[in-house]
Amino acid sequence: MATLTEDDVLEQLDAQDNLFSFMKTAHSILLQGIRQFLPSLFVDNDEEIVEYAVKPLLAQSGPLDDIDVALRLIYALGKMDKWLYADITHFSQYWHYLNEQDETPGFADDITWDFISNVNSITRNATLYDALKAMKFADFAVWSEARFSGMVKTALTLAVTTTLKELTP
């Protein structure tokens, strides 16, 4: 599996023109980051153990191919901070929510704002979060949905790249 560079991540996320495709891509990127992180959990690199135990666990049909199961394992082993676990779980849950909707909300919708307001890698960046809040709750004469949507997309992109940096083994 090829390692994603930050430029690859930025290009893939920037190419998405709606929230659904953005979150689908973000979910896929985060799952790939977790898959790349998982082998670092196994301390014994004995060839036989890797071949008969580790590889089947990490296979695409294996139990650790599920982002939620893999996250729980990483967190339970103490290899991930609570805020990071919460952020990735939150991204996964929001993606599953969007996947079940008949009509997908947009970047500027209130449900997306609620999602953003609970992503630690966004809310901990005071400058970014304060700018988003100021624009979200600005006077309608100043507020532009297209501008706000672009800013939300940027914030979510930064959240994904921040999360991936934390997943470096």
UniProtKB/Swiss-Prot annotation:
Enzyme class (EC, first level): lyase
Any one Gene Ontology molecular-function term assigned to this protein's record: fumarate hydratase activity
InterPro entries in alphabetical order: MtlR-like, MtlR-like_sf
Highest taxon in the source lineage: Bacteria
Record bears the keyword Phosphoprotein: no
Reaction it catalyzes: (S)-malate = fumarate + H2O
Keyword Magnesium among UniProt keywords: no
Entry-linked Pfam families: MtlR
Record's keyword terms, sorted: Lyase
EC number: 4.2.1.2
Xref: NCBIfam families: PRK10022.1
Function: In vitro catalyzes the addition of water to fumarate, forming malate. Cannot catalyze the reverse reaction. Cannot use the cis-isomer maleate as substrate.
Family listed: Belongs to the MtlR/FumE family.
PANTHER family: FUMARASE E-RELATED
Record text on subunit structure and interactions: Homodimer.
Protein name: Fumarase E
Gene name for this UniProt entry: fumE
